[in-house]
Every structure is written in C-alpha cells, then in structure tokens.
Amino acid sequence: MKGIPKRPISNYIEKTNETNLYKIRKGLVNEMNVEGHIYVNEKLKTLLDEEIATYELNKNSTFLPAVMQIANVSTLPGIVKASIALPDVHAGYGFSIGNVAAFDMDNEKAIVSPGGVGFDINCGVRLIRTNLFYEDIKPKQEELTQLLFNHIPVGVGSQGFILCNQENLDDALCLGMDWCVKEGYSWIEDKLNCEDNGRSLYADSNFVSIRAKKRGITQMGTLGAGNHYAEIQIVDQIYDKKSAKLMGIEKKNQVCIMIHSGSRGLGHQIATDALIDMEKSMNKYKINVIDKQLACTPIHSKEGQNYLKAMGSACNFAWINRSSMTFLARQAFSKIFNQSPDDLDMHVIYDVSHNIAKIEEHYIDGKIKKLLVHRKGSTRAFPPFHPLVPLDYQYCGQPILIGGTMGTYSYVLTGNEKAMQATFGSTCHGAGRALSRNKSRNTLSYLDVLNKLKEQNISIRVASPKLIMEEAPESYKNVCDVVQTCHDAGISNKCFRLKPVAVIKG
C-alpha cells in the first residue's frame, strides 16, 4: 500500500463556505490530480473522524478509511473536477461506497475501474405505488407479508421462477426490460419510468463469461441477501406536494412497495473477471495505481470496452430482476385484494441504479464534455427539463429513491440543477453502514431487534436469522441526517418520506 500520509489526515481536510461541503486538499496522498469533495454535516463527519482515528492508530492495517479512498481515486488518470463523497460514504473495495468520479472521454489515458462500480452492478431500487391506504392493508398485513415472502425468491442460494436457458439468458442480457415486456413480466409503461428505460445500450452478452452466465441463469428474478429487501411502505410525510402528485402520491398513509436488488452472482462474477483482466493489463498501458483495488484500464482500450459491454449486460440483468419481482408483487396484491394490479394502480414510480458507470455530458470549465461517470453507492439526480428525465417528471426533476433500513424511513427526492454543477448530477443512495457486519452480529441482540420492529408494528420475514442483526437500524447511519445533508447542500430536494410496515429479506 502506497501513499500513507506523513501528517495527520485531518490537516488536509478543510470546511468550505458552502453548506455541508468539506475539501480534501492535494497532498493527502501523492499525485492527486484533483481535490476530494465530501458532503457531510457535523454529525456525519464525526463518524468519518472516528474511522480516521482508528486507521491512524494502525497504519499498517489493510483497512483504509473512506477519506483515504476518496483521495486515492483522485490519483487515477483522466479524472476531472473532484473525487466526490456523499454523506452516506463508507469504506469499500478500492472506491468507497458513496463515491462519484468522472473521467474525460477525450483523454486517451482516462480510465474505467470496476471498483468504481462495485461487485453488485446496478444494485438499485424500484418504487411501485398503489391506490391502497394503510387502513386497507392493516387487517391483512401478516397475510400479505407472508404471501410476498412465499412469492419472491429470497436468500443466498435462491432460484428464480423464470425458467431460463442459455439462449433466453443471452437475449435478456442484451435487451433488459424490453425482454421483460416481450415475455409479459413488465408493462410497457414500466420501462418509461426507469433509468435508461431499463436497458443498457452498452450491453453485449458475448463479453459475459460462461462462469458468470452459469451463476446468473438460476438467479433471474431473485431478491438475494445482504441489504437487499422488498418492503411494503406507507407515505409518512409529503414535503413537495406538486412533485409528489406528479408521481401519483397525494395523501399520507398511501401504500407503496419498494424493491432493492441487483445483478446477483452474475454481476459479481463480471466484476471479478474484469478485475483479473485489468490487473494483467495495467503493465501494458503503463498504469500504476496507489492501491491494487483500483485496478483499471483506459476507457477506449480493448479491456475497457469489454468491461463496459459486460457491465451493461449485468445492468440489464438487474433491471430484469426488479421487473420480475414487480410482477410477483403485483400478483400477491391482486390475490389478497381480489383486484387486478391495474385496478390497484400498481404503477412504477421510478427505478434507479446505485452502482453503475455511464457516459454522460456535463459542463466542465464552461464546456460540454463527454464523461464516464462512476457512481458507486450514489444515485443519479438529474434536474427538471433534462432530456434523460421521463416525460412524467419533466417539471419536477428525476425521482431519486433512497432506501433506509428495515426499521426506519425511506425517501423520495428530486434532482436539481445544483447537482449538475456540483456532483455530476448525483446524490446519496441510502443510510450507509456505520457498523461492520461482524460488529453488528457481535453487539446486537436478535430478540431486541425483533422486539423493536414489533413495537413499531412492522411485520418481518427473513430467510437468514443473522441478517436481523446485520441489517438492524443500529448498523446504519441515520438516513434522515444523510438526506437532510444533501437537501441543505442543495444537491437534491426532499419530496416525500415513507416508513415500512412489512419487510422481506434474504
């Protein structure tokens, strides 16, 4: 590991005049091309300071705090403006989770890095509205929760309900949600309110390894484990009535379904394959990275293009996953309430990605530049009238879906112009872990967590009991602080808040 700072890390971090914005000055690590920008309030900064203090007690540890990772990313070839950390930031593989970094497509040395996307490619969130209210589901809450748990395949080894062969899988990996529409799992209008219309145009299944396909072929339409979930939620607060109305949300206690899932084993294998290829190719392109977890290759190289094509395929797989679970959720609600999903107004409000790299146009130094924007644990936040925002939301900006934890709030935000200027049109993605999974298991009580959920009248079904502690609210930062930090900084606007009444986990 190179680049251990000679002076205390805090010496390189300074508060700016802008609300909730700190800067990491050049010099924290060698050869920083740009500054680091961190969006945190005082409370969240304390968590980062604690992470730094732990690291400085043992600098020979393999653990790197998020602040160091943000600085390390700033050394990568072709990066522009800043390496950006959002308030839910925490240490990850190479790039921290909650990091945004953009690379100039016109710079032949500019890179793409799988660590800047993550292993769960296109891990993301979908929100489905209904015309039901809490009083409609309360008498049937346990029955509905159990039926959803029975319908949606969950857990590490779960297998999907979609019977898929190699030919079908290749077709699906190339078409994304268009495949779901063709097969009858999605409504046509679903894809219109989905980031990129639910289809990555980079995708080419020929660049997905046989091993990755074998892992994916049985997992299509599954939730998975870890922090993935399906929740029945109710609207708790409405902050922006006009924007909420455009999304079909008009009253408190309206029932929604939130699905958080990704590309499962297929995406993980694609990331693993790419990291191996890039570690081998860095010598060829004379790239030296400060941390081997930042393995990368020039965007326009053969290896870079191969990764983008495979990554696009994983993105499509993830959109199919969320689409097929939408199909199952609609079936479950239809069965319990004896009405069609259409009669229940079970329309997709939006579907966003939290782990992705995409070619976008942004202003840099007054000029429009084509950039490869890496968002890892962050959400696109485009403003009103942006051409990539769906027609339904042209007047309010892109909906931004922020998942909380199984005992706390989730949020819907909207994008704005400040984000385009400050963060490449990006904002936070969730609460962000505060405790490691091991620490959660060792310090939290299974029964205590269950009792707290019961006190809040939250129904829960979980395939693996250890996940109760790992995913407990105490394991995460306060999502309200995270969202408010972004709102106060002006990089996203609060629209409405949801609270869970039923949680299904792997």
Curated annotation (Swiss-Prot):
Binds 2 manganese ions per subunit. This is RNA-splicing ligase RtcB homolog. The active site is at residue 429. GMP binds at residues 227-231, 354-355, 403-406, 410, 429-432, 505. Catalytic subunit of the tRNA-splicing ligase complex that acts by directly joining spliced tRNA halves to mature-sized tRNAs by incorporating the precursor-derived splice junction phosphate into the mature tRNA as a canonical 3',5'-phosphodiester. May act as an RNA ligase with broad substrate specificity, and may function toward other RNAs. Keywords: GTP-binding, Ligase, Manganese, Metal-binding, Nucleotide-binding, tRNA processing. It comes from Plasmodium falciparum (isolate 3D7). Gene3D superfamilies: tRNA-splicing ligase RtcB (3.90.1860.10). The keyword Cell division does not apply. Its EC number is 6.5.1.8. Mn(2+) 2 binds at residues 123, 260, 354.
